[in-house]
Amino acid sequence: MAPNLSPNPSNSLDAFAAEKLAGLEAAALRRRLAVTARGPEAAAERGGRRLVSFSCNDYLGLAHDPRVIAAASDALRRYGAGAGASRLVTGNSPPLAALEERLARHKGKEAALVFGSGYLANLGIAPALVGQGDLILIDDLGHSCLFAGARMSGALTLRFTHNDVAQLRALLAEQRGAARRALILTERVFSMDGDRAPLAEILALAGAYDAWTLVDDAHGLGVVEPGQRAPLEMGTLSKTLGSYGGYLCASRAVIDLLTSRARSLVYTTGLPPASAAAALKALEIVEAEPEHAARPLMLARRFTARLGLPEATSPIVPVLVGAAESALALSAALEARGFLVVAIRPPTVAPGTARLRVAFSAAHDAAQVDALAEALAELAPDSLRAA
């Protein structure tokens, strides 16, 4: 059959994109990139305006610490701007090797493996460990990359209701016998709600059913007490450590296996040496100066107390709004008052639960926290009553 060469807008790429964008716009779900110049002390500049940012995961302000910047600058001069190859070729730089050794020691594990990002780490870990005939059980509020890695593995993947240990137990009792291997995926601190997983109970269940547990510690490292460690401890270098990248800490055997089998490590360029050096210096500071760790949570609790919200258990506090349009409007109103608090909308969160995700840093001061609380009390009293 000869191809139809007549113009057909409904089949064109641009028409398809325009139609989808119109639907997103109508639902207040279209995403846009906004140029943001981050500075020290929780400052951010957008559109020529200086704002106080409560939408950054730099929980200890280490991205602007002069010691971290100096470490990155030194690595940049010594090793160049990029790794130049995958880690298994020539992209495994000295700062990367030193960082892995320090991460493993910090987590109490035998070894560590650094990936290009936390997302890439979770894309690679599950498929390297489980597959068809295996079982993955994942918390319903787990990060998107946990679900993406689970799907790529080919294992039977079942969700359990957020932090519902009883349901997790029931699923293990029902499904574990038919599976060769089982993997439980959860987070130490949940990124959009700021609450914490009941890890002691989950790990006890895992032991009873011979299941492996991966804990995503992206938002916990350095700012919350870790409690009991899981066999698989992954996280990022881009939040508390102020740099970029992701990692897994585990036994030497597991790390050696992933070095050969994790496709998101094998088939991508290694992390830039400067990023690794920055993360290494930041981790050294976290360990040497533990007095900073409690400040983000202290400020978060000051904020929740001012507004009558449930007491914070991490530096992340959600202010639930509901409709995406309302969350955008509240974010814009706060920006007009000098605060950058970005609206979080579906599909990042469930429909009807759009929110402002307020993130606290050691770089904030009490006056900034109180001013934000005062503005929210005036602008969003209904959201605060609903909490």
Swiss-Prot record:
Keyword check for Amino-acid biosynthesis: no
Against InterPro entries, the record matches this protein to: Aminotransferase_I/II_large, AON_synthase_class-II, PyrdxlP-dep_Trfase, PyrdxlP-dep_Trfase_major, PyrdxlP-dep_Trfase_small
Catalytic activity, EC: 2.3.1.47
Residues that bind pyridoxal 5'-phosphate: 118-119, 191, 216-219, 236-239
Q: Name one GO molecular function term.
A: pyridoxal phosphate binding
Q: What class of enzyme is it?
A: transferase
Q: Tell me what reaction this enzyme catalyses.
A: 6-carboxyhexanoyl-[ACP] + L-alanine + H(+) = (8S)-8-amino-7-oxononanoate + holo-[ACP] + CO2
Q: Which GO terms describe its biological process?
A: biotin biosynthetic process
Pathway given in the UniProt record = Cofactor biosynthesis; biotin biosynthesis
Q: Which UniProt keywords apply?
A: Acyltransferase, Biotin biosynthesis, Pyridoxal phosphate, Transferase
Q: Name one Pfam family in it.
A: Aminotran_1_2
Q: Which residues carry this modification: N6-(pyridoxal phosphate)lysine?
A: 239
Q: List positions binding substrate.
A: 31, 38, 143, 348
The cofactor(s) it depends on are: pyridoxal 5'-phosphate
Task: Give the family per the record.
Answer: Belongs to the class-II pyridoxal-phosphate-dependent aminotransferase family. BioF subfamily.
How does the annotation summarize its subunit structure?
A: Homodimer.
Tell me, in a sentence or two, what this protein's role is.
Catalyzes the decarboxylative condensation of pimeloyl-[acyl-carrier protein] and L-alanine to produce 8-amino-7-oxononanoate (AON), [acyl-carrier protein], and carbon dioxide.
The protein in question is named 8-amino-7-oxononanoate synthase
Q: Could you tell me which species this protein originates from?
A: Methylorubrum populi (strain ATCC BAA-705 / NCIMB 13946 / BJ001)
